A protein has these predicted regions:
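Short, conserved secondary-structure transition motifs
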Residues: 138-154
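Short, internal active-site loops enriched in acidic
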Residues: 54, 146-150, 224-226
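Core alpha/beta catalytic barrel or barrel-like domain that forms the active/cofactor pocket
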Residues: 172-197, 218-234, 296-298
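Aromatic- and acidic-residue-enriched segments that line the glycan-binding/catalytic groove
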Residues: 152-169
Length: 832
């Protein structure tokens, strides 16, 4: 392989260790782990660390490789890299470049791990003069598989279905994975969209380790469709303007070096197309916004390629070919890092020093108001910590003037001691800017992912972007005292309802057989106002706990950091007493979630993860093919994630589902599942755009040649209907349980043009788009015109049951924190 390979009698090659030539079959994860352990036990210049484990218990590994001299001082090298990233120490002549190679974040892009074994071997091979020379001024970290659970799902499938010889016909069984495929992790999350948000166990452990090293160069290895040539940097537009000229320049240098080796072999490749650098949570952009040179490398193949597959041009793409390509770019990248080591270290140092002394962008501070929602504020603070962003609370300035994210205006506001204050004059100000800027500038509207993600909208917290620097007054907020055990025996305990933590508290109470109620209307007692949605835990009905009732409730509150109000009477000062029918009992729901072929594994996984890992609340997952087996008498809530449903197209199955709803069931339909209901007789209709039709007809009559468009402009024309992910302002009816806990406005991440007609006759329009609801992110001209005056979130009453429509996904990638309460309302409060 391009002169990189040489014999070594000490360290076994992958072929020797595995007992088969690399590329003739896919290697299970445990054998990959065994090989890395063998190399670490044999070679003197490699250190192996297990930095974590997956949800299914598989080890997550990283191999650190360097020259013997560098390995002898590896902790000093790591610490100096960390100091540079914190603007605490400048470059020195002996600091090597840390190159981090991440393989197989998408499980069914399974060539990457095979290539990682070959790369490790050549780096520790003393007989390879090239790699040993490169290691004099580089330290290479290899993570052979970021997603072992997903990869094992694919490898097991392929090894179980292939024949004695690989079948190259792509319609054969071995080239067609069953649902959900191996791309995602155990909970079907795309780990390559989770770097910044760190919602998944694998991401949390990996990024924590990454941030202990802060490498100067990071490569994320992928695969794409079978017919695609190899892709490597430089990336496509749009580039976020936080990316520096040097970062662009080094991408070009590395790309040219990769091209040199590909040209020698006559291999096809492309650059500067398709894969942009904008969304902040990729394996290339996250390192970029943290000072490194981040790159994605994409080999043609992926889950349908198997060991060998026939391409449309008649060539056979083999696993051996794919390994060779990824191995070559791995080595080529390390080569450039070695050649440019001094410049890379110098620019890396300057990056963080400049970020601290002169932060980019017009805003120099951000203030996030607590506003009575310390739980959400604490959740945001935790995300900032995970991303090395410094912050504090309160300020010596009593007030300031800044851009209000919610009103879109510059306003004067007060700064309270509980408010979170972030000063941009810090080493990680570029990441701060990317996550907080109200509107990110797009240099090209053709992009690969969502185009808006500002955290104040994602968390639903009133925030201000300030052009002047503000210094936090304290590193931590005032300590919240635990709820004390009352000496008296209160009539009831009251708990707020406005954050995920409140839902976790409710989940725990219900599972411990505590009877909980909530109020449908506001009330006042003891001189304090309580909004609709407030949880009420009365002593009456909970006598089974006996003398332990008070101790149990307060211990639960302290576990979830919930502040309780104890009241001595059910007689309120204003509003409805606790015996009123406006005080609703919360029945512990039995929840069923559908999955299976045709249903979005991502959407289903987000819900599954939400119940199991965030709420710790039981849920039954059923394949849609097996809905006839559901015990409908034991099912209170049925959730339909985004997807296509055969049962909704089948009249008998659909009628059975309607009967269940009429008898008291609650059907929650998300995204395209809601659209499928609109296509049937469910009393829900997609919004018709008669005005747009008339406008188009008028345009044709007045401009008859309007339809004559150049073929070369077809991509630009198509994005007129495109909405990859933009933020819209939703007006809420906060008197309905679906919107309890909100202040009247919800910010949604809109990813399609679906909007529903306002409902009448037993329908409640809880969340609607009115005119001028757009806030930020790219929206095609035609789609933007459509997105007004329609329903996004609603409840349709049907007999004794309800249908909850959630046109947008409130659990998107689990980072849209403000949507979690909306979804929880649909599960726990609606219809009670």
């Amino acid at each position: 392989m391009l002169g990189f390979l040489a014999a070594n009698a000490q360290v076994p090659t992958p072929d020797q260790f595995l007992g088969y030539p690399l590329g003739t079959q896919f290697t299970p994860h445990y054998r990959v782990v065994d090989y890395f352990k063998q190399v670490a036990a044999t070679a003197k210049n490699v250190k192996l660390e297990q930095y974590g484990a997956t949800y299914e218990g598989r080890p997550l590994l990283m191999a650190i490789v360097g020259s013997p001299e560098n390995m002898a001082r590896i902790e000093e090298i790591r610490q100096h890299s960390l100091d540079m990233s914190n603007a605490k120490g400048g470059a020195n002549g002996s600091q090597p470049v840390i190159v981090w190679l991440s393989y197989n974040v998408h499980g069914n892009e399974a060539v990457s791990t095979e290539a990682a074994m070959q790369a490790l071997y050549e780096l520790v091979n003393n007989g390879n003069a090239q790699t040993q020379q490169w290691l004099k001024n580089t330290v290479v970290i290899i993570d052979p598989c970021l997603n072992p659970d997903g990869r094992e799902r694919y490898v097991n499938f392929y090894n179980n279905t292939r024949g004695v010889k690989p079948n190259v016909n792509r319609w054969s069984r071995e080239h067609n994975e069953p649902w959900p495929g191996g791309r995602a992790n155990h909970y079907y999350f795309d780990l390559n969209r989770d770097w910044a948000w760190q919602t998944q166990k694998e991401s949390q452990q990996r990024v924590a380790k990454y941030n202990q090293w802060m490498p100067q160069l990071h490569v994320d290895f992928h695969e794409q469709e079978i017919e695609a040539p190899y892709y490597f940097a430089p990336a496509a537009e749009p580039f976020h303007d936080a990316i520096t000229p040097w970062q662009r320049q080094l991408q070009v240098l590395i790309g040219r070096n990769n091209a040199k080796y590909f040209d020698q072999q006559g291999w096809l490749y492309f650059t500067k197309e398709r894969f942009d650098l904008f969304y902040p949570s990729y394996g290339d952009t996250y390192p970029m916004y943290n000072g490194a040179i981040g790159m994605t490398y994409e080999q043609g193949g992926s889950g349908r390629a198997g060991v060998a597959v026939l391409k449309k041009d008649g060539d056979t793409l083999t696993l051996t070919d794919r390994i060779a390509h990824h191995f070559t770019t791995s080595m080529s990248t390390i080569e450039v890092a070695s050649q440019q080591a001094e410049k890379i270290i110098s620019e890396y140092t300057q990056y963080f020093e400049a970020a601290k002394k002169n932060p980019q962008g017009g805003y120099k501070s951000y203030v996030v108001k607590a506003g009575g929602n310390t739980e959400k504020l604490n959740s945001l603070a935790e995300l900032l910590r995970k991303n090395n962003i410094a912050f504090g609370f309160g300020s010596n300035a009593a007030s300031a003037s800044g851009f209000n994210y919610f009103t879109g205006k510059t306003e004067t506001f007060t700064i309270d001691k509980e408010d979170l204050v972030i000063n941009a004059f810090q080493p990680h100000s570029n990441m701060l800017r990317v996550l907080f800027e109200p509107v990110s500038h797009l240099t090209d509207s053709v992009t690969y992912d969502i185009t808006a993600w500002a955290l104040p909208y994602a968390y639903g917290l009133t925030s201000f972007a300030v052009k002047a620097p503000l210094t936090p007054a304290a590193d931590a907020p005032a300590v919240r005292n635990n709820t004390p055990l009352s000496a008296q025996k209160p009539y009831a305990y009251l708990a707020q309802w406005n954050s995920l933590r409140d839902v976790k508290f409710l989940s725990s109470l219900l599972q411990n057989d505590i009877k909980v109620r909530f109020t449908e209307t506001p009330f006042s007692v003891g001189g304090k106002d309580f909004p609709a949605g407030t949880l009420i835990i009365t002593r009456a009905g909970n006598t089974a706990k006996g003398d332990q009732f008070d101790r149990f409730i307060t211990s639960q509150a302290n576990q979830f950091k919930i502040s309780l109000d104890a009241v001595a009477s059910g007689f309120v000062d204003k509003g409805m007493d606790f015996g009123s029918d406006k005080i609703r009992f919360i029945k512990k729901p039995h929840v069923t979630l559908l999955g299976g072929r045709g249903i979005s594994s991502l959407g289903m996984g987000e819900i599954w993860h939400f119940f199991e890992q965030q709420l710790d609340f039981p849920i039954t997952v059923v394949d849609e093919r097996n809905t006839d087996d559901i015990d409908w008498d034991q099912t209170d809530v049925l959730i339909l994630p985004d997807g296509d449903y055969k049962m909704l197209a089948d009249k008998a199955a659909s009628d059975k589902l309607k009967e269940w709803v009429k008898n008291g069931g609650r059907l929650i339909a998300l995204e395209s599942a809601a659209a499928e209901l609109a296509g049937g007789e469910w009393g829900i209709k997609l919004k018709k755009e008669e005005e747009d039709k008339e406008a188009k007809e008028k345009a044709v009559s007045t401009r008859p040649y309007e339809a004559l468009k150049p073929y070369a402009n077809r991509e630009r024309e198509s994005i007129k209907q495109f909405i990859p992910g933009a933020i819209y302002k939703v007006q809420l009816d906060t008197t309905h349980p679906l919107a309890f806990g909100y202040a009247g406005i919800y910010y949604t991440l809109k990813q399609d043009a679906n909007l529903y007609e306002f409902m009448e006759n037993g329908g409640w329009n809880v969340g609607v788009l009115k005119k001028d609801s757009y806030l930020s992110g790219f929206v095609g001209a035609d789609t933007r015109q459509q997105l007004k005056d329609g329903l996004l979130f609603g409840v349709k009453e049907m007999g004794d049951g309800e249908i909850v429509i959630l046109a947008d996904n409130p659990l998107f990638r689990s980072f849209w924190e403000n949507g979690k309460l909306l979804f929880s309302n649909a599960v726990f409060l609606v219809g009670q």
